[in-house]
Regions:
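Glycine-rich phosphate/pyrophosphate-binding loops
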Residues: 56-62, 104
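Short glycine-rich loop/turn motifs
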Residues: 3, 16-19, 119-124
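Short alpha-helical segments and helix-capping/turn motifs at coil-helix boundaries
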Residues: 1-3, 7, 32-35, 42-50, ...
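Conserved small/polar residues in nucleotide/adenosyl-binding loops
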Residues: 2-8, 171-176
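Segments that form or flank anion-binding pockets
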Residues: 22-29, 36-37, 43
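Short helix/loop capping segments that flank catalytic or ligand/cofactor-binding pockets
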Residues: 12-17, 22, 30-33, 59-61, ...
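Conserved phosphate/anionic-ligand binding catalytic regions in large, soluble enzymes, centered on
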Residues: 39-58, 150-154
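Hydrophobic, small-residue-rich alpha-helical packing segments that form membrane-like cores
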Residues: 68-174
Length: 176
């Protein structure tokens, strides 16, 4: 996942140039397994990265996909949560995270299609801005020190995300 910066040609109050940052994440699988937490951390990840770059996150967007939430429980695929539970709990999770920090979500779009019965779509995105003076752009030099902070990383380079590729059984879902 990448952050994209756009140089703002205008100035704020005639004093300082700002950079715009756009960040998005998908949490399809985590939201399907645990809808509240999956959707909440989808937005959380979008917020975390620009904040770590000394920017101000000020707007969010959520785009999701689900099968018909009115699908009878008897038609829920084996090993899957009911669509209604996923839709309602994911909305609560995303909203909870954003509301706790006062982030406005200006655009929400949920697509309903039978194709989402097998795999949910959960996309979060934010817009952030940083004064240009907060961004230091230099080329790395031989001998520069790199400090890595964080938890252990899996072989895929993504740590906790390794769970999103694991097969999940019906027994696993019932246990959680």
């Amino acid at each position: 996942q990448r952050q994209m910066c756009i140089r703002d040609s205008d100035t704020v109050d005639g004093e300082e140039d700002w950079l715009l940052l756009f960040k998005n994440e998908t949490h399809n699988h985590p939201t399907e397994i645990e809808p509240f937490g999956g959707a909440a951390t989808c937005l959380g990840g979008c917020i975390r990265d620009p904040l770590s770059g000394r920017s101000y996150v000020y707007q969010a967007m959520r785009v999701t996909g689900a099968a018909d939430p009115h699908t009878p429980l008897s038609e829920t695929l084996t090993g899957k949560l009911p669509q209604k539970k996923i839709v309602l709990e994911a909305a609560k999770g995303y909203s909870s995270y954003g509301n706790q920090i006062g982030l406005a979500t200006g655009e929400v779009k949920e697509y309903y299609h039978p194709g989402f019965m097998a795999k949910r779509m959960e996309i979060g995105a934010v817009i952030a801005a940083a004064p240009e003076s907060h961004v230091i752009r230099e080329r790395p030099q031989a001998g520069d020190v790199v400090i890595l902070v964080g938890g252990r990383t899996g072989r895929d380079g993504m740590g906790g995300a390794t769970g999103s590729s694991k097969a999940v059984s019906y027994t696993h879902l019932r246990a959680h």
